[in-house]
């Protein structure tokens, strides 16, 4: 009888449902918090600098510089802060650009993107309340810029962002892997200066999604999805195919589900 009881107990132990991946849950929560902070900082800085003018109106260089610096600092610090927890993506284009080369699982990538979009929406809704209804700047094409031109611009800007990410962080030969996440802020700032008056230099579908959702302005919004996702994916393929000599590189995140 005792043996029978022991066998039953053992069977329950073995059939017990697997524990949830706590690391994945923490990573998704980190993406939620980090993306919220990034979008909140970027959008509020744009509002404070007076970047919420008429759609297509060029920003003065001082305004553009202020917006670029805010995004560069926020991106560099927040990516560094979350790198050891989630990889510090903050951006669906980064997540997809890393996914295409197998550095993250499809399920985790999907959860990351959902968290990033939710965070961006919450940040912009809160900002509308805290700012007393100030105009929320929405990414829009500059005067005379056609959608296809804007699309190509976003492809190139995001390509450079992911190319730098692969070169400084994912490539095992990189000599700056420990500070690579912080340095990514520099390319974000440079690209913001380069493309700010053409497309707004989004490079990040989540950064564009929140303001569009909060204001209901979706004009040419597809440009800010297709461009960054295509640019990020191309960068992943190009860098690993042509420049990643050691194919036994370490994945960005160990223990992905």
Swiss-Prot record:
A motif (NPA 1) lies at residues 91-93. It is a multi-pass membrane protein. It is found in: Vacuole membrane. Its main location: membrane. GO terms for biological process: water transport. The chain crosses the membrane at residues 32-52, 63-83, 107-127, 150-170, 178-198, 225-245. PROSITE patterns: MIP. One of its GO terms (molecular function) is water channel activity. InterPro entries: Aquaporin-like, Aquaporin_transptr, MIP, MIP_CS. SUPFAM superfamilies: Aquaporin-like (SSF81338). Keywords: Membrane, Repeat, Transmembrane, Transmembrane helix, Transport, Vacuole. A motif (NPA 2) lies at residues 204-206. Pfam families: MIP (PF00230). GO terms for cellular component: membrane; vacuolar membrane. It comes from the Eukaryota. The keyword Oxidoreductase does not apply. Aquaporins contain two tandem repeats each containing three membrane-spanning domains and a pore-forming loop with the signature motif Asn-Pro-Ala (NPA). Belongs to the MIP/aquaporin (TC 1.A.8) family. TIP (TC 1.A.8.10) subfamily. Aquaporins facilitate the transport of water and small neutral solutes across cell membranes. This is Aquaporin TIP4-2. It comes from Zea mays.
